[in-house]
Curated annotation (Swiss-Prot):
Upregulation: Negatively regulated by H-NS. Positively regulated by IHF and EcpR.
SUPFAM superfamilies (alphabetical): PapD-like (SSF49354)
Organism in which the protein naturally occurs: Escherichia coli (strain ATCC 8739 / DSM 1576 / NBRC 3972 / NCIMB 8545 / WDCM 00012 / Crooks)
Function: Part of the ecpRABCDE operon, which encodes the E.coli common pilus (ECP). ECP is found in both commensal and pathogenic strains and plays a dual role in early-stage biofilm development and host cell recognition.
Cross-referenced InterPro entries: EcpB_C, Ig-like_fold, PapD-like_sf
Primary gene name: ecpB
Keyword list, A-Z: Chaperone, Fimbrium biogenesis, Signal
This protein's name: Probable fimbrial chaperone EcpB
Residues in coiled coil: none
Signal peptide limits: 1-20
Amino acid sequence: MKKHLLPLALLFSGISPAQALDVGDISSFMNSDSSTLSKTIKNSTDSGRLINIRLERLSSPLDDGQVISMDKPDELLLTPASLLLPAQASEVIRFFYKGPADEKERYYRIVWFDQALSDAQRDNANRSAVATASARIGTILAVAPRQANYHFQYANGSLTNTGNATLRILAYGPCLKAVNGKECKENYYLMPGKSRRFTRVDTADNKGRVALWQGDKFIPVK
C-alpha cells in the first residue's frame, strides 16, 4: 500500500519524535495554477531551535526515488532557508517554483535540519549558542505540471490515474468487512500511471461513494 503514498523520510539523532520540529503535513502539493506555496512550522518546545532547510529534487517520491539534478539552479526557491525559532513560536516558510512550464510533474524532498540550542556562556562579553540535540526531517513537495492533464479510469472498485498529475482519491460508505464497523473511509494519493483498489469501503454497495480531487476541484466518480 505504501508504494502508492507519498512517504515521509524521518531520521532522528539525539532527540525523540515528540520533541522534533512540527513541520505540518508530510506531503505538500503546488497546483498547476500556482507557483508559490506556504508551509507553517512550529517549535513546540521550551527552548530556541536553529532551523536550516535544504531542497533536493527526486525522480520519484516513492521508496525507490533517487536524488536527481534540477533543470535549472533556481528551479525551486525558498525563504527563509535558515532561521532561529524561539520557544513556542511559529514561522511561515515560502516556496517559489520557477522551473519549466511543461507537462511533467516534479517531486522534491524538503530536508529540515533542526537543532536545539543552549547558551554555553551567559556573560555579556562572550555568549555563544551550542546545539544540544538535533533532528533531520524529510517531507515531500509535489509540483503539478504547469500543463496538467487530469484523466482517470474507474472500474470495479479500482481507480487508475491516466493523466500526468497526482490525484487525491477517496472512498466512503459501508465497510467491506463487518470487522471494520459500519462506515469506512479511505484516502490516498494516486500518482500518474498508478492504480489503486479500495479495500475497506464496499464500493459495490449503492451507498458506497468514490470521488477525487483534481487540484482544488472536487470530482464525484461514483
